[in-house]
Amino acid sequence: MARQTDGPIAPLPSLYPAAAFQQRVLTWFDEHGRKHLPWQQNQTPYRVWVSEIMLQQTQVATVIDYFDRFMARFPTVEALAAAPLDDVLHLWTGLGYYARARNLHKAAIVVVEQYGGRFPTDSVDEMASLPGIGRSTAGAVISLATGQRAPILDGNVKRVLTRLHAVEGWPGRPAVERTLWDIAEHYTPTERAGDYTQVMMDLGATLCTRKAPACLLCPVQDWCEAHRLGRETDFPSSKPKKVAPTRHAHALMLVDPAGRVMLEQRPAEGIWGGLWSFPQCDGAADVKDWCDKWGVGDSIEYWTPFTHIFSHFRLEMTPVLIECPRALPAEAFSRPTCWRSPAALDGIGLAAPVKTLLGRLAAHLDTVG
């Protein structure tokens, strides 16, 4: 088999006149586009940026409440930069992909300290250099908040453009992505740049969906090569699949006589970075060794394992309830710890499966208490 390269896979497809394409999609936007979402009101760079980060990998319906709560707590970039990371992660609990929240906090600090609280919206490159902001997000913030021309290429836009021109290949490949950026550059207007950005995202989110696209309602249906071929759902090509490995861990639910549970803060990098979770051991033998070492093994109860699926692996977690009759020395743990009631968890960031498990633990303690 020939070795796959990242070089050009095909010449740039024949493109439609940009002005005609813009007129079609913007006419559709004027009648059907989304205009009443919370972040579309008072479109400052800060509000648009927060919404764009939240909308990565997350549905609009889910984001609305999170966005409103976030804005109520952090109404300005200065407020976000000044907040403890724990406060940010707490408000992010349930949205997943927690690196987004950590980068949001880092970027806010950079904007305040290096740019005096003003986003560098005059430069896509400068915007894209902020933590967690790539070229497409930078373009979205600039065009939506300021009206300046700045192409975008998020997942929705990739889907629209790959179908429009039947662009073969997974968009994550550099050569395919370069082709799509060239197409995006061609069609992006100078006038009504913000509306154009919004309509391209709207088309992908509401009509040109992954499954069962509503082609009959699409303003460029008669131009769409994938539709002409009857291959709409073949585009964009899927990412080459790898078998996701399974990792195993035991979650130590250490409960003291007052019914409080021990939580440990995870490292800043890696899964659930900066969030609070249970101390973990790899296997049952490690659990026993740890309990024997610290003298807390008199009452151990293994719960039914559950599986949590990450983007690149599966985590099989076995909860272990351990009665902890006395305080443990600091050296028993390698990270910051705290004792909290499982029913009173305000102010700390928790991954969704940990929050669910704490809810189960609270119910269990109520039953046996």
Model-inferred region functions:
Residues 12-17, 24, 28-229, 233, ...:
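Catalytic cores of DNA base-excision repair glycosylases
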Residues 1-35, 40-41, 205-369:
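Intrinsically disordered, low-complexity, charged terminal extensions of DNA damage-control enzymes
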